[in-house]
A protein has these predicted regions:
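Two-component/phosphorelay signaling modules centered on CheY-like receiver
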Residues: 13-31
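Active-site residues of response regulator receiver
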Residues: 54, 82
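Short, flexible helix-to-coil linker/hinge segments that flank and couple to helix-turn-helix
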Residues: 90-95, 99-133
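Conserved sequence signature across two-component system core domains
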Residues: 9-10, 33, 51
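Active-site beta3 strand of CheY-like receiver
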Residues: 46-52
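Receiver (REC) domain active-site loop signature in two-component systems and cognate sites
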Residues: 57
């Protein structure tokens, strides 16, 4: 079976390295970009199955980049990886087409679940983001 292809977007190289190590055994990580505009360009060119992106990035934030991609007909599933626990960010990410909203503090336990859910068109939100434990 072919591995799902993932593109990462985060402006912290150390975090990109950790995410890659976490995802690589199960998925094909195509690469990483460090800002929202580069994400839009790379997603158009590479057509990944899933985008794992940070909310707060330079040039174009993750929410705006997701909106732009969806408006252009991008079919990639979107999983946000973030430090923001504010419900307004969660709502904005879901409204922008996100199927996953993962706390960076729970990345090791939640990210694989979120990607799997996104690939099957289901929403996954880290329990800490919804006030659960």
């Amino acid at each position: 079976m072919k591995k799902a292809r993932i593109l990462l977007a985060d402006d912290h190289p150390h975090l990109v390295e950790k995410v890659t190590q976490l995802l690589q055994p199960e998925y094909e990580v195509l690469g990483a970009v460090s800002d929202g505009q580069a994400l839009v360009s790379a997603a158009e060119r590479l057509k990944p199955d899933v985008l794992v992106l940070d909310v707060t990035m330079p040039i174009l934030d993750g929410i705006e980049a997701a909106k732009k991609l969806k408006a252009q007909g991008c079919e990639s599933k979107i999983v946000f990886l973030t430090v923001h626990s504010d419900p307004d960010y969660l709502r904005a990410c879901l409204a922008a087409g996100g199927l996953g909203y993962v706390s960076k503090s729970r990345m090791a336990s939640d990210l694989l679940h979120a990607v799997h859910h996104a690939l099957t068109e289901r929403i996954f939100i880290s329990p800490t983001m919804t006030g659960q434990k």
